[in-house]
Amino acid sequence: MKQVTVALLFGGRSAEHEISIISAQSVARHINPDHYRVVPIYITRNGRWYSEGIASSILELDIAALIRKSGTAAASLKLQEMVLASGQQPFSFTFAGIDIAFPILHGSYGEDGRIQGFLDTVAIPYTGCGVTASALTMDKALSKLCVSEAGIAVAPGVTVLAGDWEKSPEQILSSIPETLIYPVFVKPAHLGSSVGISKVSVQGELPEALAHACNLDTKVLIEQAMHGKEIEVAVLGNNDPIASACGEIEPGSDFYDYDDKYIHNTAKLFIPARLPEELSRRVQADALTAYRALGCRGMARVDFFVDEKSGQVVFNEINTIPGFTDISMYPQLMEAAGIAFPELCDRLLQLALEPEQPAKT
């Protein structure tokens, strides 16, 4: 069998830069070397692309340990130093000979349709969702509208544009409906890994949280906090996707934030989730409905809040390039479904080669 050449894209311009590297390291370890030749392509925070030499060195760096020991800022500085010390010139490589791209670029400029559009333009097939689905799912406000239209419950909330907040914060605060019950979460609409999210317990805390989120994004959501368990479902496939069993997150802090995910690692994961079987099946069905409603293909992780007492299932968000780190839920859910990490990588690469077809009804 001829080896397939895979461009592994990682790093990127988003706040999730370091997490992307850790995910790419996991993928590189698990791709079958008998079937695939991996060409690492590292994208710096300022958008410079490097292949082979420095990209390979970064894949070997234990960046997870560095983050835990010294923090994200120290890890970022280390990466910059490595690039400078390499003396390597950016963009000094060709896409000739690349058969498939495997973007592991979390957040902006990777998960939002931009890299997908570039790859479509140069006619390189790639893992995961296409341009439209990536752009829709990256925008938490738009994805909520789509899944709500498909009949899935969403949290009550309002959307604030950063430009409007900057011009007239008093008007924005006065326009927030009194029916919104505190606590609420203030979320940048286009960021992942819980970056920029604040929990607001009383109205007086809202201006600071909004100012912080509007500093990070052009659009912000204010969402009523939902009671219940944080449940995640891994979905895999194109026209006939499959849903994993439900996974449950028990946060180690007030909510499942960036530090809890990647630095302190205090959250507990339960696979399968501690839910009645009938309720679990409903969540799985809603995950597939959301996946199809948003036009996803390849993979996604769909997140919900589930109140076991009332039976309420509320859509939270969808991630089209979920984490692939050792502690990430997506590969663990697939492992529990009988799809080991190497097979998961293989399936994603094979799905990337399937032509898009109208979904079956």
Curated annotation (Swiss-Prot):
Q: In which pathway does it act?
A: Cell wall biogenesis; peptidoglycan biosynthesis
Q: Which PROSITE patterns does the protein's record reference?
A: ATP_GRASP, DALA_DALA_LIGASE_1, DALA_DALA_LIGASE_2
Residues reported to bind ATP? 177-232
Q: Which residues bind Mg(2+) 2?
A: E317, N319
Similarity comment: Belongs to the D-alanine--D-alanine ligase family.
Its domain of life reads Bacteria
Q: What keywords sit in the KW lines? A: ATP-binding, Cell shape, Cell wall biogenesis/degradation, Cytoplasm, Ligase, Magnesium, Manganese, Metal-binding, Nucleotide-binding, Peptidoglycan synthesis
Record field: catalytic activity: 2 D-alanine + ATP = D-alanyl-D-alanine + ADP + phosphate + H(+)
* A GO-annotated cellular component: cytosol
The record's top EC class is ligase
Q: Which organism is it from?
A: Chlorobium phaeovibrioides (strain DSM 265 / 1930)
Q: Which InterPro entries match?
A: ATP-grasp, ATP_grasp_subdomain_1, D-Ala_lig_Van_CS, D_ala_D_ala, Dala_Dala_lig_C, Dala_Dala_lig_N, PreATP-grasp_dom_sf
Give its E.C. classification number: 6.3.2.4
Which note does the record give on the cofactor?
Binds 2 magnesium or manganese ions per subunit.
Per the UniProt record, one Pfam family is Dala_Dala_lig_C
* Protein name per its UniProtKB record: D-alanine--D-alanine ligase
- Residues that bind Mg(2+) 1: D303, E317
What region holds the ATP-grasp domain?
144-350
Provide the taxonomic classification: Bacteria, Pseudomonadati, Chlorobiota, Chlorobiia, Chlorobiales
Query: Which GO terms label this protein's molecular function in UniProt?
Result: ATP binding; D-alanine-D-alanine ligase activity; metal ion binding
* Biological role stated in the UniProt entry: Cell wall formation.
